[in-house]
From Swiss-Prot:
GO terms for molecular function: 4 iron, 4 sulfur cluster binding; electron transfer activity; iron ion binding; molybdenum ion binding; molybdopterin cofactor binding; nitrate reductase (cytochrome) activity. It comes from Vibrio vulnificus (strain YJ016). Mo-bis(molybdopterin guanine dinucleotide) binds at residues 85, 152, 177, 181, 214-221, 245-249, 264-266, 374, 378, 484, 510-511, 533, 560, 718-727, 802, 819. The gene is napA. Gene3D superfamilies: 2.40.40.20, 3.30.200.210, 3.40.50.740, Dimethylsulfoxide Reductase, domain 2. This is Periplasmic nitrate reductase.
Length: 829
């Protein structure tokens, strides 16, 4: 069908309205694919490839290439807007150094760890991989192999990879890069509510009276959502915006109140607010008595370091997540020391400002939306910080109603939909199930048609532990997909690079571009990107969105899904399962892992005829792969509070927020009348907990593992900028974005620069015990640190700033703290 873009947009609007009303439209109006007569550009919808906001874009293709993108005016998330990265989506797939065929390190015609990258066929690549995997399995067993995935995997890619590792290879050594960004949020949700992901949604932006950003720079990291806050603030004079951070950034420009606090002291600020609420009789007793219980967190739990690290040895209760029941009076006593005087002293924030913030939470007539992302989660006490903010909302009853929302934002397009909901973490299964729970394993084994005892009960190696196990030669075969951890992860020189180059190990990296991670590998597999494949993402508000493949891949590049499924064909079940399992499931004897995982009568039950647009993966395997995987995965959540709609529905809408029950999405969870799982008459029902009550968890301030001293006298904070996404793999290959911000710089306070004899543009050496980098100084611009702190973004592959970061983690979530470590700054002569 041919139509103008205007007609296309009108048809989309009509289709959306008709879907709500249950009306069937003529094909010309219902079709979500269109072509412009004037330009011969075909348009289709897709979620943006970048952050976790989940904007929808219209993608224009011509002659097999993406030639244009624009904001989707029918999308409820972004309403036609895109940030600057989204506007240049059409260029991310066409960098000059795009990888087009497998590359294996070779010397004298065969694989060699010290050889040069040499083009090989897919058969040679997979044969080499399979040989290494089989040798490792035979010698050391399934714990010697591992996989590091991504919050950028599609739902189907993550599901297939997790199934291959946990059911096929029987190894839980799979973890996503979301471990570095969302793990503390996950554990915070699970401890407080017993179920993951926000209870609110983006509609809260249009209802809140006060916005509190806990360490988040939404103006640059979630700019489209920031426009909704901006619109709310500028059109409603009573609305207040509060921004808390360790340095000044662009979000402060809109703020009514800005709070620059000392690193780690957010713990003290949050506890002060809880104390203020109690002391000023602002507790919502009806809510607290009916819907909460009180717990005390175990303290002095260490920093997730190696067991022989002196800092870890000092901990009295290393890695303990235990909690004990306490009364309200005991909780009150635990926060009493956090007076305004004490909180001000610890944080550096003026007393009157702290009281101003606390009053907004305490006022029963003020609807408050708390927002956070990496500033809170990348924290050695990130789980505690998540809990402390929930405490404030629970004490006041400001939760799960329009405008009252503690909202954890995500940084990747499917950190929620894939990493969390699918369960690609080393300890998880789909729909909030975990490998350590025998009932959960039994559910997974039933859905996957596995004999009892297939899935190992012990969690696998998490991301940071994977690096250590590679370093120590315990983990020997390792597959990295859809991330650039050699640039993004911490302590590169100390753990990761030695692990990748360990002669005992074989490292495979699937990526579209020759990243720092790819260059450290032994085998590079070229990967299809974004709309070169069909897929689905899940965004920060529980919205699942799907898209069709719209262009072919470049060269011999293949999707991560194709790679996982095709690789599984290289293994007979006798090579991956012990005899006792095969004896329980003799039907799998002589079969391949592919037969067991994907040709199981469930994944392969949808014929190609059901695919409205045929995609390369489905064409290759002979059935509608994406639908089969999605529908099998959805079985985990339906009826368990994670209900998803039928797969085909997602291609007709701009996403739906789960749980989707009887065709209706859920905006506010846990609230009677909004959430179908909330019991009638309950008011609120936190059904993730057996008694339907959320937990208010007491946790104190505890110091970071390292602090500045006489030698390393400055704090270092790393992060992002508006124009680049994560390590810049895609955005630095977009000419306009590269020209806008070509290099990372060291943002420093002018007085700190002056004290070191530095001027703007001077080159400095930033160093600590873990390494050093050279970077130029910036004393002006968007980021303005206080004295004693520098900020350096990590998008620049020439400046591997994260190699200075200690691989300390929150002991409960295993998430790294990228926001504070001591360094020294010296001028390069």
């Amino acid at each position: 069908m041919k139509m103008t873009r205007r007609a296309f947009v009108k048809a989309n609007a009509a289709a959306s309205a008709a879907a709500v009303a249950g009306i069937t439209l003529p094909a010309s109006a219902a079709n979500l694919i269109a072509s412009s007569d004037q330009t011969k550009i075909t348009w289709d919808k897709a979620p943006c490839r970048f952050c976790g906001t989940g904007c929808s874009v219209l993608v224009g293709t011509q002659n097999g290439k993406v030639v244009a993108t624009q904001g989707d005016p029918e999308a409820p998330v972004n309403k036609g807007l895109n940030c600057i990265k989204g506007y240049f989506l059409s260029k991310i797939m066409y960098g000059q150094d795009r990888l087009t065929q497998p590359l294996l390190r070779m010397k004298d015609g065969k694989y060699d760890k010290e050889g040069d990258f040499t083009p090989v066929s897919w058969d040679v690549a997979f044969d080499t991989m399979a040989e290494k995997w089989k040798a490792s399995l035979a010698k050391k067993g399934p714990t010697s192999i591992g996989m590091f995935g991504s919050g950028q995997w599609t739902v189907m890619e993550g599901y297939a990879a997790a199934k291959m590792m946990k059911a096929g290879f029987r190894s839980n050594n799979i973890d996503p890069n979301a471990r570095h960004c969302m793990a503390s949020a996950v554990v915070g949700f699970m401890r407080t509510f017993g179920i993951d992901e926000p209870m609110g949604c983006y509609d809260d932006f249009e209802h809140a009276d006060s916005f509190v950003l806990w360490g988040s720079n939404m103006a640059e990291m979630h700019p489209v959502l920031w426009t909704r806050i901006t619109d709310r603030r500028l059109s409603h004079p009573h609305v207040k915006v509060n921004v808390l951070s360790t340095y000044y950034h662009r979000s402060f420009e809109l703020a009514d109140s800005g709070y620059i606090f000392k690193p780690q002291s957010d713990l003290a600020i949050a506890n002060f607010i809880a104390n203020y609420i109690i002391q000023n009789d602002a507790v919502n007793w009806d809510f607290v008595n009916k819907h909460t219980n009180f717990k005390q967190a175990t303290t002095d739990i260490g920093y997730g370091l190696r067991d022989d690290d002196p800092l870890q040895k000092q901990a009295k209760n290393p890695n303990s997540g235990n909690m004990t029941s306490i009364s309200f009076e005991e909780y009150k006593k635990s926060v009493a020391p956090y007076t305004v005087e004490k909180a001000s002293e610890m944080s550096g924030v003026a007393q009157d400002k702290l009281i101003e913030l606390a009053k907004q939470y305490a006022d029963p007539n003020t609807k408050v939306m708390s927002l956070w992302t990496m500033g809170m989660n990348q924290h050695t006490r990130g789980v505690w910080m998540n809990s402390l903010v929930y405490n404030i909302h629970l004490l006041t009853g400001k939760i799960a109603t329009p405008g009252n929302s503690p909202f954890s934002l995500t940084g990747q397009p499917s950190a929620c939909g894939t990493a969390r909901e699918v369960g690609t973490f080393a300890h998880r299964l789909p729909a909030d199930m975990v490998v350590a729970n025998p009932k959960h394993r039994a559910i997974a084994e039933k859905i996957w048609k596995l004999p009892e005892g297939t899935i190992p009960p012990k969690p696998g190696f998490h991301a940071v532990l994977q690096d250590r196990m590679l370093h120590d030669g315990v983990l020997n075969c390792y597959w990295v997909q859809c991330n650039n951890n050699m640039q993004a992860g911490p302590n590169i020189n100390g753990e990761r690079l030695p692990g990748y180059r360990n002669p005992e190990n074989f490292i495979v990296v699937s990526d579209p571009y020759p990243t720092a991670t790819a260059q450290a590998a032994d085998l590079i597999l070229p990967t299809a990107m974004w709309i070169e494949k069909e897929g689905a993402y899940g965004n920060a508000e529980r919205r699942t969105q799907a898209w069709y493949q719209q262009v072919g891949t470049v060269g011999e590049a293949k999707s991560d899904l194709w790679q996982v499924m095709e690789f599984s064909k290289r293994f007979k079940m006798e090579e991956v399962w012990p005899e006792e399992l095969l004896a329980k499931a003799p039907q799998y004897r002589g079969k391949t892992m592919y037969d067991m995982l994907f040709a199981n009568g469930q994944v392969d039950k949808f014929p190609l005829s059901e695919a409205r647009q045929l995609n390369d993966d489905s064409h290759h395997f002979g059935f509608y792969v994406q639908k089969g995987l999605f529908e099998e995965y959805a079985e985990f959540g339906r009826g368990h509070g994670h209900d998803l709609a039928p797969y085909d529905v997602y291609h007709t809408v701009r996403g739906l927020r789960w749980p989707v029950v009887d065709g209706k999405e859920t905006l506010w969870r846990y609230k009677e009348g909004s959430d179908p799982y909330a019991k009638k008459g309950s008011g609120w029902d936190f059904y993730g907990k057996p008694d339907g009550k959320a937990l208010i968890i007491s946790a104190p301030y505890e110091a970071p593992p390292e602090s500045p001293d006489a030698e390393y006298d400055m704090w270092l904070c790393t992060g992002r900028v508006l124009e680049h996404w994560h390590t810049g793999t895609m955005t630095r290959r977009v000419p306009e974005l590269y020209k806008a911000v070509p290099d990372a710089v060291c943002y420093i306070h002018p007085e700190d620069a002056k004290a070191r004899g530095l001027r703007r543009g001077d080159e400095v050496l930033i160093s600590n015990k873990r390494g050093e980098v050279r970077v130029r100084v910036e004393t002006r611009g968007r980021n303005r640190p206080p004295q004693g702190l520098v900020f350096v973004p990590f998008f620049d592959a020439r400046i591997l700033i994260n190699k200075l970061i200690l691989d300390a983690t929150d002991p409960l979530s295993k998430q790294t703290d990228f926001k504070k470590c001591p360094v020294k700054i010296t001028k390069v002569a």
